[in-house]
C-alpha cells in the first residue's frame, strides 16, 4: 500500500509540471508544463522543483505515516481516482504511448528504489515519536510490519539489478572484497559513533555490535567467493534457505529469539551473524529472479506487458507460498530472516515493482526531480538520514514530545533531507563510496 501511495503522489506531482533535471552535459534544465509541454531552460530553478516535490510527495507521505495513518486507505482511494481522471485528460494530448515514451524497466526500478529509500528515511526517525503507529514499527519476534520490510527490501533491490543478475562479469573474488571495504568501514564507523555517544541500540535487532552495513558486507563477500552464473543462483539460494530453515526448526530459532547471550563475539551478535544465511539466500533468489524476469536472453525486455504479467504472476505464487509457510512451517520472523520472511519480502517487493512498471502506461509518469536526486545518491541519502536521526535523538526527548512538536520536527527533518540531497545533486556532485 505504501509503494502504491508513493507512486500515486509522484503521478499527481508530475501532472502539475515544472521539473528540473541534469542533462548529459551537466546543464540544468527545467520543464514547465505549458500547452504542448514546452521545455524552458532555466538555471537555478531546481530549488522550486525540489520544493514542489517535497510538498506533493514527501510531506503527504509523512502525514500518512503519522497523523493521517488511519486514513491511508481513504487517501489511496481518493488519489487513485484523481490520478485516473488526470490520466484520461492527459491522454487527449497523446496519440497513444509511442515506443520509448513510457518509463523503461530501469527507470521503474529506480523509482521503486527511491520509494524504498524515502520510506525508510521517514520511518527511522518517525518511529521514535508517539505519533508513529506501533503497527508500522519492527516486530520483536514473529509477525510483519512496514519497517520489517526494510533490510530485506534493500537486499532484494540490489540483487535484482546486480551485475550478476545482468550476467555481467564482476571480476574475481579479490575485486569483490575490495568493493566491500566501504561497507565494512561504514559499519565500523556506525559502531564506534553509537558506542562513543552511548546511543540507544536495539540489541534484539542485530546484536550488540552488528548493524545493517555488516550484513550487506557479508552478503557481498559470500557472493564474491561463491560466484556462479545467475541461472544457477536460484537453486543455490533455495538450498541455502532450506538448510537454514531446517537448522532453525531444529532449535536454532529458540536460541536466536531468546535473551541468552554468551561472552563470545558470535553469541553477542547472534541475530546478525546467523541471519546472514537467510539474507544471502534471499539475495541469490533475487539475482535469479532478476535474470529470469528481466535480463535473460530468453526475455524480451521491450515487451512491457509480458514483463509486468510475469512479475505479478511470480508475486502471486510467492504470496501463496508465504501463506503456506507461515501457517505450516514457521511464522514470519525478520529477526531470524527465516524462509517465510524471505518469501514475504519477495512477494511484497515484486508486487511493488509490478505497480511501478504498470504505471509506465500512464502518460503522466516520469521521474520527479527529487527522485532523480535521491537515485543518484542512495547511500548518501541513507547516511545523512541516519546522521540527522542520531542528532535529533540526542537533543530531543522524542517519547514526550507533543503531537504538534513531533510533526514539526519530522517535517523539518524531511525537508532538510530533501533540500540537502537536491543541493548535492543539482550542484553537479554525486556521492559514491565505491
From Swiss-Prot:
UniProt key word Transmembrane: yes
Annotated membrane topology: Multi-pass membrane protein
Transmembrane segments: 48-68, 70-90, 112-132, 141-161, 173-193, 206-226, 232-252, 271-291, 305-325, 344-364, 380-400, 404-424
Places the protein is found: Membrane
Coiled-coil intervals: none
GO CC terms of this entry: membrane
Signal peptide start-end: 1-17
MF GO annotations: O-acyltransferase activity
One of the GO biological process terms: GPI anchor biosynthetic process
Keyword list, A-Z: Membrane, Signal, Transmembrane, Transmembrane helix
Protein name stated in the entry: Uncharacterized protein At4g17910
Organism: Arabidopsis thaliana
Amino acid at each position: 500500500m505504501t509503494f502504491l501511495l508513493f507512486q500515486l503522489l509522484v503521478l499527481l506531482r508530475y501532472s502539475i509540471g515544472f521539473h528540473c533535471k541534469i542533462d548529459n552535459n551537466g546543464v540544468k534544465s527545467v520543464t514547465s508544463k505549458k500547452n504542448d509541454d514546452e521545455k524552458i531552460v532555466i538555471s537555478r530553478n531546481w530549488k522550486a522543483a525540489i520544493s514542489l516535490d517535497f510538498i506533493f510527495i514527501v510531506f503527504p507521505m509523512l502525514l500518512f505515516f503519522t497523523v493521517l495513518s488511519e486514513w491511508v486507505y481513504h487517501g489511496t482511494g481518493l488519489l487513485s481516482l484523481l490520478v485516473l481522471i488526470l490520466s484520461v485528460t492527459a491522454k487527449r494530448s497523446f496519440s497513444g504511448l509511442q515506443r520509448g515514451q513510457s518509463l523503461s524497466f530501469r527507470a521503474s526500478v529506480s523509482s521503486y528504489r527511491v520509494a524504498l529509500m524515502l520510506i525508510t528515511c521517514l520511518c527511522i526517525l518517525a518511529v521514535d515519536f508517539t505519533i508513529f503507529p506501533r503497527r508500522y514499527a519492527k516486530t520483536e519476534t514473529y509477525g510483519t510490519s512496514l519497517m520489517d520490510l526494510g533490510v530485506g527490501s534493500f537486499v532484494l533491490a540490489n540483487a535484482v539489478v546486480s551485475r550478476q543478475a545482468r550476467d555481467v562479469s564482476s571480476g574475481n573474488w579479490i575485486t569483490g572484497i575490495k568493493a566491500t571495504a566501504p561497507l565494512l568501514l561504514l559499519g565500523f564507523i556506525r559502531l564506534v559513533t553509537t558506542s562513543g555517544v552511548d546511543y540507544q541500540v536495539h540489541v534484539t535487532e542485530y546484536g550488540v555490535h552488528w548493524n545493517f552495513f555488516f550484513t550487506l558486507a557479508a552478503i557481498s563477500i559470500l557472493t564474491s567467493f561463491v560466484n556462479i552464473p545467475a541461472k544457477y543462483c536460484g537453486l543455490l539460494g533455495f538450498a541455502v534457505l532450506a538448510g537454514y530453515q531446517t537448522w532453525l526448526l531444529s532449535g536454532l530459532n529458540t536460541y536466536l529469539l531468546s535473551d541468552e547471550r554468551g561472552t563470545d563475539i558470535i553469541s553477542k551478535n547472534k541475530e546478525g551473524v546467523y541471519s546472514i544465511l537467510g539474507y544471502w539466500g534471499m539475495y541469490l533468489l533475487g539475482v535469479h529472479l532478476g535474470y529470469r524476469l528481466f535480463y535473460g536472453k530468453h526475455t524480451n525486455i521491450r515487451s512491457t506487458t509480458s514483463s509486468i504479467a510475469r512479475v505479478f504472476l511470480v508475486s502471486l505464487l510467492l504470496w501463496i507460498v508465504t501463506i503456506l509457510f507461515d501457517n505450516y512451517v514457521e511464522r514470519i520472523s525478520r529477526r531470524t530472516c527465516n524462509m517465510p520472511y524471505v518469501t514475504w519480502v519477495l512477494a511484497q517487493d515484486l508486487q511493488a515493482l509490478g505497480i511501478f512498471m504498470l504505471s509506465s502506461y500512464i502518460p503522466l509518469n516520469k521521474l520527479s526531480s527529487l527522485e532523480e536526486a535521491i537515485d543518484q545518491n542512495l547511500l548518501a541519502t541513507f547516511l545523512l538520514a541516519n546522521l540527522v536521526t542520531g542528532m535529533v535523538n540526542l537533543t530531543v526527548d522524542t517519547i514526550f514530545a507533543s503531537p504538534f512538536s513531533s510533526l514539526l520536527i519530522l517535517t523539518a527533518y524531511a525537508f532538510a533531507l530533501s533540500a540537502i540531497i537536491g543541493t548535492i545533486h543539482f550542484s553537479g556532485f554525486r556521492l559514491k563510496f565505491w
